[in-house]
Amino acid sequence: MNQDDIKQKIEKVIEKCSDPEIYSNIIKDIFTIGIDKPGTYLNSLEILPNINEKQLKKNFEANKRILCDFINQQKRDSIFYQIFSCIFGAFTGDAIGGFCEFMKYSKSNYKKIFKEMPVFQQLPGQITDDSEMAMCLAYAIMDNPKKETIDPNYIYFYYGSWAKSEPIDMGFTTENAFKDFDFVTFHPQFNNFKNVQNEISKDNYNSLSNGFLMRKSTLIAWMYNRFFFQINQAFDDTINNNNNKYLIELYEKIKEISHIDNIITHPNIETDVVSAFYSIMVLGAIKLLEPQKIIKILLNLCNDNYFSQKGNVDLKLARNIIFYIEQFKNKKFDFYNYFGKEGSNNCVYKHMGWYEHALKLTLYFLVNFDTFKLKDLYKNILDQICNLGGDADTNCCIVGAVIGPLIGLENFGDYFKKVLDVIPRDRYIFSICIMVIYVKYLYNSNRNNDILNNECYFLKSVLTLLYGEIEID
């Protein structure tokens, strides 16, 4: 089969994608994922075909330039490009940060670690639970027949299916939420989640670990597509007119949507508030606002009198964000002394997995974005986070979702090339395929047909990176 034949086959698949209801079936057809194959889920070894490594390398080298060329050709301000940059930034951060997880702070060059086997034995370029759960969330959104809403039953089902597939990594809070999950008895259409919700709330309510935040990239992408005009109105009005009415409405809407996802594993109300503030940062980045404008939006929101009328949780977080931003603006602020010094309450290693570390790191890099050279910005930011050790994969993932769209895929630089260069089996390209299909789904579910003409070319590239000459019925 020649390249033209491959392109025609994939074009047929793309044509089928005009109906959003069959997206999940297309995913299962192409990648053989589904509940009928427990143990072969997402990042499992068994999900990939047995490919000759030499042939894979040959195919990879031949097609790598196609993928890079596609990325460089995209319009910087297209929604497709921006959403993809967000998810790709999160996934790349996860894959690279995983090599430094659970390590203590060190100013030494952490790249030496790449020569060793990380704590969870993942391969270079392999994503961990952060990105896998984000993909599960994307599946849940695509499978839900009510396209205008988020359904906790579908989210619980896909998270649970993943949790029972023996993933390489899973946090304690998440694991606890799915200890009683059963493939056989649970089906999302039966609204079964309400039967286990109280038990999860009782067990996990006190958890403020970062697991709820690390998976948000795909949900935020859905929100950007779903509430595009409301987001633009809210941001433009607060930036240009200092009017926060629409921004506050957006904040409450994001809290409501985030709650549907958070209650699956992290039912504490504080997680909804954190998710709202974080989502506003990511949405601002996807909209291609300058970092200082994103900071202005946050400060306008947090300083609004609205929060004095809210509960203690909203008010506390708003005041904390104002305080952190002012701290990070100080030119004498010492990054490593603040985040790396043992014994400090801010030490990333000491309080490993706490959501507040990731939130503060995201704020820090937004405030100081302009101090980095664009060419090496993504690399330098991940360098700094990885050097802190602790829960490095999740911190890099959460920060990466914001930084990705701000710098654009063409500026991922050495990190992007490094991840592509070291893939011995193609778990990472597989996740890129899922990202492409999900972003296309978001377009079609909103009946917005302004999709890039060469998206099929891109999907062909990433699929042939994995399979060489492929058969798609």
What are these regions (language model features)?
Residues 2-473:
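Structured, active/binding-site neighborhoods that engage oxygen-rich ligands
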